[in-house]
Amino acid sequence: MTRRGLTLLELLLVLGILGVLLGLALPLLSPNRLALDQAARSLATQVTRARLEAIRRNAFVGLQVFTEGAGGYLLFVDQNANRRYDPGEEFGATHFGQGNWARVRLDPEKSALGNMPLLFDPRGIPAKPITATLVLTSGGATRKVVISQQGRARLE
């Protein structure tokens, strides 16, 4: 006689394994964590966008980080060639602490760009080759956006 079905022990073992996997995956799927990942990816993408806009426009284009409030960044075209952001030069801005990114913050103590813009020359090369790290936080989670001396951004 052959038995069909599962024993109680097998069923409990499967439920236990599923519970452990769900417990490990649940923190990664929280809305705060997803918003933080999305904000970090967006920031890295905007660094690339600034580089490509500098080449496309044949002008100095930069990314200016600001730490007021929850922080944020803006893209600008340096129209007067002073190599810094002036009001009216921006063509894209993102503010953390609003909308989908309501709990995302730029950590000014751990971010190493300060008030200096990340500026790309018309060839898409950083005007000042620096390595910068921008740290975004949401609750207890953090994501780093590291910008290399060549102007390429990566997530950590």
Curated annotation (Swiss-Prot):
Pfam families: GspH (PF12019), N_methyl (PF07963). It is a single-pass membrane protein. InterPro entries: N_methyl_site (IPR012902), Pilin-like (IPR045584), T2SS_GspH (IPR022346). The modification N-methylleucine is found at L6. It is found in: Cell inner membrane; Cell outer membrane; Periplasm. Residues 1-5 form a propeptide. SUPFAM superfamilies: Pili subunits. GO terms for cellular component: cell outer membrane; periplasmic space; plasma membrane; type II protein secretion system complex. Its main location: membrane. Keywords: Cell inner membrane, Cell membrane, Cell outer membrane, Membrane, Methylation, Periplasm, Transmembrane, Transmembrane helix. GO terms for biological process: protein secretion by the type II secretion system. Disruption phenotype: Mutants have a wild-type piliation phenotype but are deficient in transformation. The chain crosses the membrane at residues 6-29. Plays an essential role in natural DNA transformation but is not required for pilus biogenesis. NCBIfam families: IV_pilin_GFxxxE. This is Pilin-like protein PilA1.
